Amino acid sequence: IECYLKEGVYPELVEQLYQGTGGNPLLLVQLLTSLDGSQDITKLLQDPYSIITRRLSSLSPEARQILDVISIFAGKVSFDILTSLLTKDALELIYLCEHLKQYGLLSESSDSGTLEYSFAHDQIKSIVISQQTEARRRILHLRVAQYLETQQQDTTLQSYETLIYHFSAGGNRFKAFKYRILSLNLYAELCYELLPTLEAGVDSEVPAEDNMLNFFDELEHDLTTFRSSAFESSQDLDKLEIVLLYAESRYCIHNGIYEKGCALLDRLLQRENALHDTAMLIKTHLQYIYYGVQIYRTDIIEQHLQLGMTLLGDDVC
């Protein structure tokens, strides 16, 4: 309080501020930075959160746009991302961010030399979001999703799940569906081949083991829906179907659901042969080999080992 008011700080004022804000640092800072000597502090304390609302309403459209974009992200946002999404001059943008920081709306930090911004308090973010229209929020989510998609370098579960979140919130059901399948396939690769004991994270899009088959059924239903709508490329859907069947077959073989797993592998072979997808054919024969190992059938192992080597050709020499 002394830092902001400099003078005129007396015990009654301190008690009045504490009673009005409950000692909430956010409300204290917003209240103190909004006082210009002419305002009645009693009126301000009647609805302390209105201070934030009034402060937001006084911002320029450009400054408000920055807050809207940052509100789409879960945490901190780098200055480079803001520059790319808002297509503003870097000097103009840094000036606006500094202005928002002085207003107590944003906080600034540096991570390994990267300048980042986030809301000074979650309550400010909540108020910003509450003032957005559904249309604006969907457009912002789509813009963020499209940007992250173009910048994607590492295929990780976290990167896929971030894309799923933004595409879903933006209303692009097909892109969300696509990354659900790719995320599931990557999870299957880790869990059922490389790290059999790995579990999905708490916030993962991948469901718990006991709900996995239902999840596969939902994705197959979505695939059928997209095919019937004819809005998406059939070639893209064919590729996603192969990835989905491959992930589901690995889950079934790994967990001893052999009848369903083998049926899926047979479907895979048919689809891959029709599309002349040699790389996936080889992977499918490898799944048959894993199946043969699990049930101690050397004839199955030998059969699919030979078929796989034939597809590989000279590469196995």
Language-model features, listed with the residues they occupy:
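Short helix-adjacent coil turns
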Residues: A74, Q158, G171, C191, ...
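The tetratricopeptide repeat
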Residues: V77, L140, S159-T162, Y179, ...
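Flexible helix-coil transition and linker loops at the boundaries of alpha-helical arrays
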Residues: E149-T156, M212, D222-L240, Q270-L281, ...
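Tandem amphipathic alpha-helical repeat scaffolds
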Residues: I127, Y165-G170, S183-L186, A200-M212, ...
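A short, hydrophobic/aromatic-rich structural module that often spans a beta strand
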Residues: F79-D80, Q235-M280
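Helix-turn-helix repeat elements of alpha-solenoid scaffolds
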Residues: E98, A135-L142, T155-Y160, L194-P196, ...
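A generic tandem-repeat structural signature
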Residues: K260, L265-C317
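Short secondary-structure boundary elements
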Residues: C3-N214
